[in-house]
């Protein structure tokens, strides 16, 4: 195992910068997830760590070595790919053992390592099968087994679950979590799936357009998004973002102005103590933090357009002063399309963002 350091890592293609100065210190045994939409640079960053892409600027450290100029085989890493990359003519045993044979390890050590990894991954009864005789989940286990037997300093995972169906992804997430708990190998994992990121990560890096939006634990990122991008990307449904205005008067008040002519503005109350907002800002509120209430307690009303019942949860989709919002409901709530739903919310659950910079605005202590 080893620490992994990314220091001002950059990537250019034909003069176009696609990765912009990434900095991160990854501790020994830590599981880091890089999450973001397609095209944000996450796989490019992973491939630079692996040595499969040249680094335009900055440094990658594995342990106490700068590895920029080292070949992939010299970096002491093992990579698990999205498409499994198994040899179809080889058995499970031979696929897992192939890299060790190339390195010239003794047969006894190869056998011991493969059997140990097969035991961890419950592949012991499948060692003589060919990949075509395996399910998708079993093939992915073989790919992980091939990485485990190398006993690398760092594991690299490039969207390894994206080819699996939804039910199998849930199972494999649990198995990956348990695998890391047992091995405690430093791991860097790339995904576009926020659920994978939230469930697997010790810490997560949210990328957008080749830039770091936020680094933190899953709970930190969810509870205190650093930007409107993070607020809208992490969470399902995502955080509601509503434009508001600060109005002077008898104590500064916050209003949601109508999105269209004829929409009634909603007055949300006075500005919280210590919060200094620009004249125009964005208010964020997660669906589960909006509380349906009696009309005389409401700070605003949502015009309900659709109710989605999901069994354990229900969501009302509608408009607040003409702006789209989602409200999480009690699954037994008698709310229907066409209702005018009175809502309230705790000030502790409100988030504020600068619409110009898109960054979070914090209240002063």
From Swiss-Prot:
Alphabetized GO MF terms: ABC-type glycerol-3-phosphate transporter activity; ATP binding; ATP hydrolysis activity
Protein topology in the membrane: Peripheral membrane protein
Localisation: Cell inner membrane
Source taxon at top rank: Bacteria
Single GO cellular component term: ATP-binding cassette (ABC) transporter complex, substrate-binding subunit-containing
GO biological process: carbohydrate transport; glycerophosphodiester transmembrane transport
Positions with a binding annotation for ATP: 36-43
Keyword set includes Transmembrane: no
Top-tier EC class: translocase
Catalytic activity: sn-glycerol 3-phosphate(out) + ATP + H2O = sn-glycerol 3-phosphate(in) + ADP + phosphate + H(+)
Protein keywords: ATP-binding, Cell inner membrane, Cell membrane, Membrane, Nucleotide-binding, Sugar transport, Translocase, Transport
Domain ABC transporter: 4-234
Enzyme Commission identifier(s): 7.6.2.10
Record function comment: Part of the ABC transporter complex UgpBAEC involved in sn-glycerol-3-phosphate (G3P) import. Responsible for energy coupling to the transport system.
Subunit-structure text: The complex is composed of two ATP-binding proteins (UgpC), two transmembrane proteins (UgpA and UgpE) and a solute-binding protein (UgpB).
Similarity field: Belongs to the ABC transporter superfamily. sn-glycerol-3-phosphate importer (TC 3.A.1.1.3) family.
UniProt name for this protein: sn-glycerol-3-phosphate import ATP-binding protein UgpC
UniProt organism field: Ralstonia nicotianae (strain ATCC BAA-1114 / GMI1000) (Ralstonia solanacearum)
Gene that this sequence comes from: ugpC
């Amino acid at each position: 195992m080893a620490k992994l350091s990314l220091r001002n890592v950059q990537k250019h293609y034909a003069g176009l910068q696609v990765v912009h100065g990434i900095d991160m210190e990854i501790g020994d045994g830590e599981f880091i997830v890089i999450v973001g939409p397609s095209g944000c640079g996450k796989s490019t960053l992973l491939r630079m760590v692996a040595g499969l892409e040249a680094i335009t600027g900055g440094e990658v450290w594995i342990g106490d070595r700068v590895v920029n100029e080292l070949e992939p085989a010299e970096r002491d890493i093992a990579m698990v790919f999205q498409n499994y990359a198994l040899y179809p003519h080889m058995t499970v045993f031979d696929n897992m053992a192939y890299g060790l044979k190339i390195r010239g390890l003794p047969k006894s050590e190869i056998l011991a390592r493969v059997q140990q990894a097969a035991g961890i991954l419950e592949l012991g009864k499948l060692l003589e099968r060919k990949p075509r005789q395996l399910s998708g989940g079993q093939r992915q286990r073989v790919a992980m087994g091939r990485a485990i037997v190398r006993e690398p300093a760092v594991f690299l995972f490039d969207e390894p679950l994206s080819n699996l169906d939804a039910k199998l992804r849930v199972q494999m997430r649990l198995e990956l979590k348990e695998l890391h708990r047992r091995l405690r190998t430093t791991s860097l994992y790339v995904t576009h799936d926020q659920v994978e990121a939230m469930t697997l990560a010790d810490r997560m890096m949210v990328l957008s357009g080749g830039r770091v939006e936020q680094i933190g634990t899953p709970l930190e990122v969810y509870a205190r998004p650093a930007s409107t991008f993070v607020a809208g990307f992490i969470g399902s449904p995502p955080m509601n973002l509503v434009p508001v205005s600060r109005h002077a008067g008898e104590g500064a008040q916050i209003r949601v102005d109508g999105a269209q002519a004829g929409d009634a503005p909603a007055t949300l109350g006075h500005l919280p103590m210590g919060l200094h907002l620009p004249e125009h800002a964005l208010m964020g509120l997660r669906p589960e933090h909006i509380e349906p209430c009696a009309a005389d307690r409401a700070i605003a009303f949502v015009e309900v357009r659709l109710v989605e019942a999901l069994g354990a949860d229900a969501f009302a989709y509608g408009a607040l002063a003409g702006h789209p919002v989602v409200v999480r409901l009690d699954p037994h709530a008698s709310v229907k399309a066409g209702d005018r739903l009175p809502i309230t919310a705790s000030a502790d659950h409100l988030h504020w963002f600068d619409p110009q910079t898109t960054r979070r605005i914090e209240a002063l202590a």
